[in-house]
Structure formats: C-alpha cells, structure tokens
C-alpha cells in the first residue's frame, strides 16, 4: 500500500520544524563534543606516540566506503564530572562491515582516563557484546586500556553484570562459534589484559602494544626487579614466548590489515540474505518529518503513518491489524531494501 502524508498547517509545520531542527543541531553538537575524546592535549599526546584514535582505527579496518553504525555515543554524557568527564564512556562501540561481514567493534579510547573502565564503560561494553551475541556478529576488540578505574573499582568489579561479565561473554560467544578478535594497540593492564588473552585470534603492535596484569612499577615494588614494558609484556614476548598473542605487527596499519585478513579467513556466513530488488526512495523527503512532529509530542496527537511514509522504501508499507488496538500501528515495510517490521 502507498500512503500519502497529511501535512499540518504551514504555520504549525514551520514552528515544529524549527523546534526539531534546533534539537537535531544540539544532538550534533553533543556528538561532535564526545568525538574530541579526552581533549586536544590528550589527543596530541596520543598521536605523538604513533597511535590513532579509536574511530580512526575502526575506519582503517572497515571496508572502503562502508558505513559505521556507532552505538551509545552519548553514554555517560554529563556524568563523572568530578573526574573531568568520560566522553562516550571512554569506549567506542558499533557495527561495521569487514569483507562484507557485519562485525561488532569495541575500541577503547586511551585519551579518556587511559582507556580505563568506569561503571558506564562496563555497561556499554556489555551492551555491545549482548547485541553481538543475539545477532551472531564477530567481535573485534581494539584494546588500549589500563583496566578498571581504580577510584571506582567497588562499582566496577563485584556484581554479576560488572567487569567480569565481559570475559564470561567472550567465553560463551567463542564457544558458540562467534569469532572473538583483538588488536592490542596500546597498554593492556590488569583487567584489560584478559580481553585479548581470551580472544580466538589476536594481533599485537610492537612498541605500543603490551599485555600484563601489573606494569613495571608494580613489578619493581613487589620484586625489586627493573624491567621495561616491552620485556615484560611486549609484542615479541607474547608472539614468540608466551603465545598469548598470535600475530606480530610493526605498526597499527599492519595490525589492522592483519585483522582484515583474519576476518577474510573466518569462512563466516552472514545470517541475513540481502534483498536484490531495486531500492526506492520514500515519496516524501525525510526533512519534512521535522514539521510533522509536534513540539509537545506527548500531548498533541499526530498520525504516525505520516512518519512511516517518510522513512520506508517507496513510502510503501503493509499494515497489520489496522482496526484492532488502534493506539498502536504495526506494519511490514522495507528500509534500504531490508525487510522488517
């Protein structure tokens, strides 16, 4: 069926559109803010070490020109202000395509408190794993983390849905045949060390990549031994002696190429079959939605079908039980050629 949107009066439409465009601009501003990570100085220091930012790392792995669906970008917004804030909860998660396969990415942002885990960081990481588990998405972890944020460790470690659940999920997904892949692109200390160790296949970068439960200062305090990070848990140690990591990389770029090679050799079958029918643009531009939605959407009634026609392919949808339970609209439609409800 084709539905033609019923537009509200022009003065109301313009007022609504102005209001919602302002909300959209505020959202974009917030998204731009969190993408700055820990701030200009932290980013400069990060780059000076030859390290890329988490979103830059993800883009290096994705198929050229393919989209990345970032999840929970505003997690921990306006929280932990006493600690200076934790943009995006200090971790970037989302779904992207590698050799045509949708994969779940979890990338620590070391410019934000050294990539350490706050309570909301754990929650965001677990949410990404849950989505991956439900949809059988291979997981790619770009690890650059100092483990738990120690001043808040009592809120990070103890419960069944806290930090340890991350490793439990990795074990369950691996056992279920969902690939777990890691690129160690920075320090992996304490809890952060378990993520690559529990993956099915991992890559570690020479120099910046390290894996150990306790770093050189703690080793010195406990044993009196002076040891460098590289000798304690660097790329050479873990690829030639301990066997914790599987692949040695001279640079991050080489590491990301190896990650792509790993995905290419998974013999992985994507669950969803793609619809090859031609894509039809909606009959009505999405921009008009701003004018249809009332400013006070919980008080002013509007027909949600008008919104649907601006979103679905060809503005076509098949409504289900139209005369029953009329406060809810259920329908079948295609969105970018993907069939759904």
Task: Specify the residue positions occupied by each region the protein language model found.
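Conserved catalytic cores of soluble enzyme domains
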Residues: 143-271
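Non-catalytic terminal/interface segments that mediate subunit docking, oligomerization
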Residues: 74-104, 124, 133, 298-341
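A conserved hydrophobic secondary-structure block that centers on an alpha-helix together
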Residues: 112, 118-140, 146
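Flexible beta-alpha connector loops of hexameric P-loop NTPases
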Residues: 111-120, 152-160
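A short, small-residue-rich loop immediately preceding and capping a beta-strand
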Residues: 103-106, 114-117, 137-142, 175-188, ...
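Terminal amphipathic helices with adjacent charged low-complexity linkers/tails
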Residues: 246-308
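N-terminal amphipathic, basic-rich helices that act as targeting or association modules
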Residues: 1-102
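Amphipathic alpha-helical
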Residues: 48-77, 281-317
């Amino acid at each position: 069926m084709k539905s033609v949107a019923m537009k509200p009066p022009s003065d109301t439409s313009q007022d609504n559109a102005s209001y919602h465009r302002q909300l959209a601009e505020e959202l974009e501003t917030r998204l731009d803010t969190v993408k700055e990570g820990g701030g200009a100085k932290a980013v400069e220091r990060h780059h000076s070490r030859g390290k890329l930012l988490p979103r830059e790392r993800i883009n290096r792995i994705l198929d050229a020109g393919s989209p990345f669906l970032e999840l929970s970008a505003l997690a921990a917004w306006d929280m932990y202000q006493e600690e200076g804030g934790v943009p995006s909860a200090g971790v970037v998660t989302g779904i992207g395509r590698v050799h045509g396969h949708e994969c779940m990415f979890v990338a620590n942002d070391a410019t934000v408190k050294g990539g350490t885990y706050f309570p909301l960081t754990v929650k965001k990481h677990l949410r990404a794993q849950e989505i991956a588990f439900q949809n059988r998405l291979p997981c790619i972890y770009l690890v650059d983390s100092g483990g738990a944020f120690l001043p808040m460790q009592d809120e990070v470690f103890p419960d069944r849905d806290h930090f340890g659940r991350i490793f439990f999920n990795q074990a369950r997904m691996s056992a279920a045949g969902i690939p777990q892949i890691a690129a160690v692109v920075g320090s992996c200390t304490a809890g952060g060390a378990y993520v690559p160790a529990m993956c099915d296949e991992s890559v570690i970068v020479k120099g910046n990549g390290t894996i150990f439960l306790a770093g050189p200062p703690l080793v010195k305090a406990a044993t009196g031994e002076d040891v460098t990070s590289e000798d304690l848990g660097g790329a050479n140690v873990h690829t030639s002696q301990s066997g914790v990591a599987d692949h040695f990389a001279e640079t991050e770029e080489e590491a990301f190429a190896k990650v792509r090679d790993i995905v290419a050799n998974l013999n992985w079958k994507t669950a969803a079959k793609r619809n090859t029918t031609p894509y039809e643009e909606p009959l009505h531009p999405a921009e008009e939605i701003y004018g249809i939605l009332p400013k006070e959407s919980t008080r002013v009634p509007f027909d949600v079908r008008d919104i649907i026609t601006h979103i679905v392919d060809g503005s076509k949808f098949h409504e289900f039980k139209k005369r029953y339970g009329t406060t809810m609209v259920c329908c079948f439609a295609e969105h970018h050629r993907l069939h759904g409800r």
